[in-house]
Amino acid sequence: MAAISARPLTQKALKVASPDTLHLVADAPVPTLDQDDSVLIRVVCVAINPVDGKSAELSPTPGATSGTDFAGIVVALHGDAKSRTETADTIKTGDRVMGFVFGNNPHVLGNGAFAEYVTLPRRFLWRVPDHMSLEAAASLPVGIASVGMALHYLHISMSSLLQAVSRSIAAASASQHHDGAFDSDANVFILVYGGGTSTGAIAIQILKAAGFHPITCCSSESASRAKRLGAAATFDYQSATCGRDIRDYTNDSLTLAIDCLSESASMAICYEAIGSAGGRYVSLDPFPVRGCVRRSIVPDWICSFTQFGQSIPWAPPYNLDERPDDHRLAEEWYHLAQKLLDAELIEAPTLEIRSGGLLHVPEGVAAVKLGQIKRRKLVYHISEEALP
């Protein structure tokens, strides 16, 4: 396997050229292994996320490599990482891994998923389980990270999640029936608005494994899959009584909601669905302030890039200071999520796989931005070469 000194010096990469424009560069520097646990990965597949197009349009950083989600093969480790004692859980050269990176990053222009190589700290990578393809793996990282961050912002502790997930894994390994009901969480509903989205589907599965009762708003086309993944009930977001129906179903007990669409209409339904005692609402994007119509509900929103321990120097409202708690939480969450992946408790979304490499990725970014990709995740092969 390639040593650090043998890695190539240049690579192909998609760079932000101007607002809403990505340009393929043939001789971009390969990112360096600066941190003591840095890992260099040969990118095999990437997935397209809404943030890829949104950030390039609203807060472009000319010269920065774009892209978030990827899966690939570890080709090199920082010297300090190589010298550490290896365990069964240690990521090493030759491993298949997946992760997401802060693309379009003003702090680090040369690191993004839309490239032949990417680097990340080892603690922010997941090993791809043997049962999972690299195409499927590329579709999951930012969704898994976002769900973990959302649960943190809902004030659900990692220790309680770990205990519940461990019971789910034990039940699954013993081929026992698992109904999702564990101890104090047995009657706790959590609303996932957008159960047909990739992140919403991941949230349903994780909440089910953690012993909650996930319920979801989604389209009628997405309802059957949401139920198969673990939703206790589905509600059609187009119904004029959607919010009231959820409140009736939960007997006015709903206190927690994750909004994967983060629009005025989705926020309104979440606010109507949350019971009279109030609760917490977390969106995956900045929410419209005019939607805060109930003082008993505490709203917040997440930006998963805060997990890396840096500020986010994008244009408002995405200009965020460092959030040390998010960074600490992420390290715990990655360990827990690896257990879920290994136990086959997280299923990848339906995929649309395209070839053509980096040259055609901007077409996919535009398609996602225009809403042309629905109920599936767009994945591109970056490297068609079989790696050792």
Swiss-Prot record:
Say yes or no: keyword Membrane present.
no
Q: Which residues bind NADP(+)?
A: 51-54, 219-222, 237, 284-285, 373-374
Molecular function (GO) terms listed?
nucleotide binding; oxidoreductase activity, acting on NAD(P)H
Binding-site positions, substrate: 142-149, 304-308
Tell me its EC number(s), please.
1.-.-.-
The metabolic or biological pathway listed in the UniProt record of this protein is: Secondary metabolite biosynthesis
This protein's record includes keyword Lipid metabolism: no
**Induction details:** Expression is positively regulated by the cluster-specific transcription factor tenR and is induced during cocultures with the natural competitor fungus Metarhizium robertsii.
Q: What is this protein called?
A: Trans-enoyl reductase tenC
Species the sequence originates in: Beauveria bassiana (strain ARSEF 2860) (White muscardine disease fungus)
Q: Which taxonomic lineage is given here?
A: Eukaryota, Fungi, Dikarya, Ascomycota, Pezizomycotina
| Gene name of this polypeptide | tenC
